[in-house]
Design a protein with these regions (language model features):
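PP2C/PPM-type serine/threonine phosphatase catalytic domain
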Residues: 1-258
């Protein structure tokens, strides 16, 4: 199964048309109540392939911003080739991690970044993530998968101490256990997922976004939206009714496979 690509949101994005499927993308990133936006969203295209990166930089004083941008730049370079096998994904993650470490050496800082990365090639999706930036997958409008956070609060969920919904405002929600540029930067890789008949939707978002938009609201607004731009903006409206004046940066990227 081939894809028809329609890219509205990525700056400089191209439109490539093949057969059978249409891919629409959109991304949004906002500094929220902070002075600096440490998040980065990037959408890459290579022929008929689409790759999406979302990262949440850690470190403050613009260091987090530099880290997430460095990781995105390294992954963009890696995306010039195929990104289908475990070895290719692991190497791409290693390149991104090295870029953050090189940044630390040059600046003397301790900046890090979380990451979620999605690769769509032909009829196959693969992804990897580090930290608490999430990927959600919806099939025909129903959530069928989400990544597991690498965080202290998610460990509390696994131990039965709190529920998944309580993770949103848990006292340890900002303590990530894995990050690029950190001691543990090992990505969690997915197995290849074949996109069978039906409509697939992918949402990648930082904690500043998913903390304020619940999964049932993601499904409801998805059902009411014709494009990824409509969907993300509908979810942002929900977010803006709930955030405080000093809320975190928030970033989301969506892919519609139709």
């Amino acid at each position: 199964m081939n894809f028809k690509l329609f890219g509205k949101s990525a700056p400089g994005g191209k439109t490539t048309e093949t057969a059978q499927r249409t891919i629409l993308t959109y991304s949004l990133s906002d500094k929220g109540g902070k002075q600096i936006n440490d998040d980065t969203a990037a959408i890459f295209r290579n022929g008929g392939n689409v790759r999406v990166f979302v990262g949440d930089g850690l470190g403050g004083y613009a260091g987090g911003k530099q880290a997430s941008e460095a990781a995105a730049k390294a992954l963009k370079a890696a995306c010039r080739g195929n990104m289908h096998t475990d070895a290719q994904l692991i190497q791409a993650a290693a390149d991104a991690n090295r870029a953050v470490f090189d940044l630390q050496k040059r600046t003397g800082g301790k900046m890090k970044t979380t990451m979620v990365f999605l690769s769509l090639e032909k009829d196959t999706a693969r992804w990897m993530h580090v930290g608490d930036t999430r990927l959600y997958i919806f099939k025909d409008g129903v959530r069928v998968f989400q990544t597991a956070d690498h965080s202290v609060s998610y460990m509390a969920v696994l131990m039965g101490e709190i529920t998944m919904d309580q993770i949103r405002f848990h006292e340890d929600r900002n303590r990530v256990l894995r990050a690029l540029g950190g001691e543990n930067a090992k990505p969690e890789l997915s197995a290849p997922r074949t996109l069978e008949d039906g409509e697939y939707t992918f949402l990648m978002c930082t904690d500043g976004f998913w903390e304020y938009v619940k999964e049932d609201e993601m499904e409801r607004t998805l059902a009411e939206s014709k494009t990824p731009e409509e969907w993300i903006l509908a979810m942002e409206k929900i977010l803006l009714t709930r955030v405080t004046t000093d809320n975190d940066n928030y970033t989301a990227a969506a892919v519609f496979c139709r």
